[in-house]
Regions:
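Pre-Walker A-like glycine/lysine-rich segment at the N-terminus of P-loop NTPase domains
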Residues: 1-31
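Phosphate-coordinating catalytic segments in nucleotide- and nucleic-acid-processing enzymes
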Residues: 35-189
Length: 189
């Protein structure tokens, strides 16, 4: 894309035919968000690994620079942040102080397969992991936490008001089973 504007919400789903630009749009967003982890900027980081500038630039127009930006709006604020990548792979960042606090979860299409045991998440940011590798750890830690009533998609009296009961309800409703995740004391699994 030379220029595209996308409106994103709490859950955004990209659909379309092959080579329509879904992955390119997602990679641009991920590239911006992974700049939170580095002062110098990253083409290769936690969310994506793009390689080198020469591999991602538009060779048809002989691009010597890549510019990517986004505007973030929420109830309290609106701000823009952007990056520019030149042929020497120098990344110039603009206004990334505010994006550091942006709540963002990315679950890659390539997820972890079936394992005998799953590792605990020992990272500072407590999530399910980019590949879902910490999903069971997250479930074991959050199982008993209450969920706000407005977040229920079914009747509370049918399932209870905690995260684990809601997960079990929906797994049973969709696939006919429930799940238990427990930590093994004295280990990181």
């Amino acid at each position: 894309f030379k220029d595209i504007k996308l409106e994103l919400n709490n859950l955004t789903l990209f659909t379309g035919v092959n080579s329509a630009g879904k992955s390119s749009a997602i990679q641009a967003i991920l590239l911006l968000l992974q700049q939170r982890q580095s002062e110098n900027g990253l083409l290769n980081g936690k969310y994506i690994k793009l390689g080198r500038f020469q591999e991602v630039r538009n060779t048809i127009i002989n691009a010597r620079k890549i510019d990517i930006g986004m505007t973030v709006k929420n109830a309290d604020d609106e701000f823009e942040c952007s990056i520019a990548i030149n042929s020497e792979e120098k990344i110039t960042k603009n206004n990334f102080e505010k994006i550091k606090g942006l709540d963002f979860v990315y679950l890659c299409a390539e997820r972890i397969g079936v394992e005998d045991v799953y590792k605990q998440n020992l990272e500072k940011e407590y999530r399910i992991g980019i590949h879902g590798e910490y999903a069971f750890d997250y479930l074991s830690k959050e199982r008993m936490n209450s969920i706000a009533e407005q977040d229920f998609r079914n009747m509370e009296e049918e399932t209870g008001s905690n995260f684990g009961n809601q997960v079990d309800y929906w797994l049973n409703y969709i696939m006919g089973y429930s799940i238990t995740a427990e930590r093994i004391p004295g280990t990181e699994i």
